[in-house]
């Protein structure tokens, strides 16, 4: 009987991640922290098709079916609702914004976008490309639509499509990002809401002609419950924002109501790729990531053959 009571007590004090408050490593390390950092995330977070990953471009496989996307409603101007959700800044989307193409099985409706960042320009992205991390990473989250324009609620492997954009620090102000940056001061505390001045999603992204180069793999949400239901598209062309715009995120936003812990390093550690394959679109410009001899040998062979002829 005593053993049974001890086991029940242990089960009570060790709830799953879904039942307790999850957090990032920077929060879990705080004195008197009672939240579960990434190492303690449970459930699907312990499975083997998790995200984010490091994309090794030389090991990606060309997939001719990865054609350019069609973006519908991305040019729609609106005063979008934004909030501090205690883990990131989140912008609600929808209102006839959706994507198709890119070898997706059907249309996917935009639900929200959010970002991950550090206060250092090489630590804020969740994914990395050839070992390189970026200042930030923006996720535009879409859900699969069924007949009648309804969002699918099943647990299929392709339930969610996330478009991931790396964000790089540059010397010019990104006017498309500025409405969101200006709203940050109104979102300092968790669970606060505001709206951005009239803007459109398209203005936050790289030029449309540069969006045909991307990587694709099957993965998961990067936060609990880490559902393995995500088709990931990681674009090669980064978004560029000014350093001052970048720093506003870690200066203005806080994890806590007391505003003691600045929101930064909201990044899940890289997960093993395992036996998954990462694909690349035909437009991907990663040829130069190949070893130099691999590039030079065919070229020199052609030149010698031409000379002998």
UniProtKB/Swiss-Prot annotation:
Residues 1-17 form the signal peptide. GO terms for biological process: bicarbonate transport; response to steroid hormone; response to xenobiotic stimulus. Substrate binds at residues 222-223. Coiled coil: none annotated. Residues 20-282 form the Alpha-carbonic anhydrase domain. Its cofactor is Zn(2+). It catalyses: hydrogencarbonate + H(+) = CO2 + H2O. This is Carbonic anhydrase 4. It comes from Rattus norvegicus. The lineage of its organism: Eukaryota, Metazoa, Chordata, Craniata, Vertebrata. The gene is Ca4.
